[in-house]
From Swiss-Prot:
Function: DNA-binding protein that induces severe bending of DNA. Required for DNA-binding by the FACT complex, a general chromatin factor that acts to reorganize nucleosomes. The FACT complex is involved in multiple processes that require DNA as a template such as mRNA elongation, DNA replication and DNA repair. Also augments the fidelity of transcription by RNA polymerase III independently of any role in the FACT complex.
Top-level taxonomic group: Eukaryota
Species assigned in the record: Kluyveromyces lactis (strain ATCC 8585 / CBS 2359 / DSM 70799 / NBRC 1267 / NRRL Y-1140 / WM37)
Keyword terms, alphabetized: Chromosome, DNA damage, DNA repair, DNA-binding, Nucleus, Transcription, Transcription regulation
Entry's family note: Belongs to the NHP6 family.
Residue ranges: DNA binding: 18-86
SMART domains: HMG (SM00398)
Name of the molecule in the record: Non-histone chromosomal protein 6
Gene symbol of the encoding locus: NHP6
Length: 93
């Protein structure tokens, strides 16, 4: 008989920590999810994701460019917020 597994405690996430940056695909998916649901009523969550993935793969570089730009801007936002968060966290300790 296998020994019972010990539950590991996850470190609680700080609610003041900055939100992670979204990828270009996530910007695309957020923008197109409702459209896919409207075109395919009654499909499951997994099927929505599969269709979005196929649509993303079908885009050429020019069509992906606006989403890549949004992702780059969001990455810069995250990096600056993270630096500020780390600095204020270090001061409070």
């Amino acid at each position: 008989m296998a020994a019972p597994r010990k539950k590991t405690q996850r470190k609680k996430k700080d609610p003041n920590a900055p939100k992670r940056a979204l990828s270009a695909y996530m910007f695309f998916a957020n923008e197109n999810r409702d459209i896919v649901r409207a075109e395919n009523p009654g499909i499951t969550f997994g099927q929505v994701g599969r269709i979005l993935g196929e649509k993303w793969k079908a885009l050429n570089e020019d069509e992906k460019a606006p989403y890549e730009a949004k992702a780059e801007a969001d990455k810069k936002r995250y990096e600056s917020e993270k630096e500020l968060y780390i600095a204020t966290k270090a001061q409070s300790e």
